């Protein structure tokens, strides 16, 4: 089931909210868990056992770790637990990648398994691993109630595409959370904002990308239009989902971590990754980079740590070489910045912004490429290589047709609208008017989104494939 679907908006969500708030306090987690299982199993119930197995592995492993008599036993059990928890992810997502590359290297013809990847497995696996490691470290106590732990992992607002919510983020709220009209109103506002990002901006930019892919008259201009459109689409698609997740979490009394903070306004790649998919970056920092020694090691080991972490980050996104190269590209850029470039970028902010936008755009072309060869063809075409025309009549038509949505997306990817709204609210006599206008705008946006959905087709979020 999708957040951006009529089934969810008209039927599931209202029923879920009604049953949840009618349920007594001690039953709310059970209602949330049952609703989440219905949400997850709506389209593909065959994947419910996979999620249940990962949840059970996480729950039982920490109970076993708690019985260990010494540190050595705990470490062995921790390693076994993490391997057990991550096995379904490796098997479902990466088995065919390893088989394909083994066949290429050895000349064998081992048949591919062709396993469909369970929705959200990359996200809920990382949540369970973080919980296991945190309990082992003594950062959080083990959750003794299996239903409460299952509700934490399977909670539908953040289940299929994050943010990656750590147990420590919401531990107290799982046991006792506060509900209020103000928090619920905030949640609705965030949800409608995210839904609008997805339906009214990301999906429309997706139409332009569809025209590019179907076109037989591609030009240099059209390649740049595609690259910019995809860069904006993936931001509004993913940040829109994160807004909806944070909003739904607030409706049910939870405070989920933010996942985006205007990443395209960054002046360095280091800053970009502090603003983009923040929960994933923090996960790799705390559970891979720091345990490897972080930067408190010899230079050669530090470089190795950087490359390993970013190769893993790329590989997490997909079982293909273009994702690995995408991660390694950022490893190289971050090493250059940390070695000598950062002081220069801090003094020359404009150059820093342009540098970030250029490499992030090139990175997303690699990210979206069907293969490394396809990526190279795109780059050559973007810079006028081969026999490609600079511009065609068809491409100009699409530029005129989508110019407004591209400009809207560019402005929306910056904090300018929020800052303008904040300044207007501070003016005397305007706050009440703006509050009413905001409510009316949100209602209009919601109705417009529903109208688009009624008239539209299946529109999954881009990050569902990861």
Predicted feature residues:
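Membrane-embedded transmembrane alpha-helical bundles that form the catalytic cores
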Residues: 1-465
